[in-house]
Amino acid sequence: MFWTEESIAFLRDAAAMNRYYETIAERIAPQLPENAHICDAGCGIGELSLALKPYCRHVTAVDADELAIKTLEAHLIEGVTARCGDMETLAPEKPYDAMVFCLFGRTQDTLRIAKKQCRGRIFLVKRDYSHHRFSAGKVSLGEYTVGSTENVLREKGIPYTVERFTAEFGQPFRSLEAAERFFALYNRSRSETLSKDEIKARLTVGPSAEFPYYLPHEKALCLFTVETTDIPEEAI
């Protein structure tokens, strides 16, 4: 994802309003080894990294986007380290105890990275739906879905466990104009746009005077757990 000041502001508002990242962290936590050093790969602005910290010794948050990492650095807590660069080249001195790939990367790529950088479990969080939610028209998510991930793991003979769950990640807005900017920012359709009336029809009453409008979004997700020892060298 290409981050901008506006997209970061939208996400921080949504994260503050919902327990989305906390919910994901709570699903991962029971499967983490004790005193673990984990990597949040493709961390973005690090909201999940911060939510994971109570369940482990240290979190290394990695993303290639400089603005995203600068945003995380401005809100760091003890036990979280932010690193800016390509996951492929930013290998740790010692292998991570676990790695989290939340809505990040092709499954084939994550398996390759994890095999080189992790000695324990990897957690792949994928969208459990097939089309982009904020676009005009029907825009496919392509290979970044649960079905695609399952196909890759099965084809390579890699055992895994899977857990489906939902987490509310709606977007609060300070104005209708902000909602229009949001849909313009996240519309992936090349030929269609939503009208003001269509946007307004998707909104509900917001939670406060500061945020009078709200876009509900109960996000269907799937958590795949894979042991790196089960990833054969020939599969990567």
Tell me what each language-model feature is:
Residues 164-236:
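Conserved Class I S-adenosyl-L-methionine
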Residues 143-157, 161-163:
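Short alpha-helix
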Residues 18-35:
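Conserved alpha-helix/loop element of class I SAM-dependent methyltransferases that forms part
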Residues 119-132:
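Conserved beta-strand signature within the Rossmann-like core of class I S-adenosyl-L-methionine
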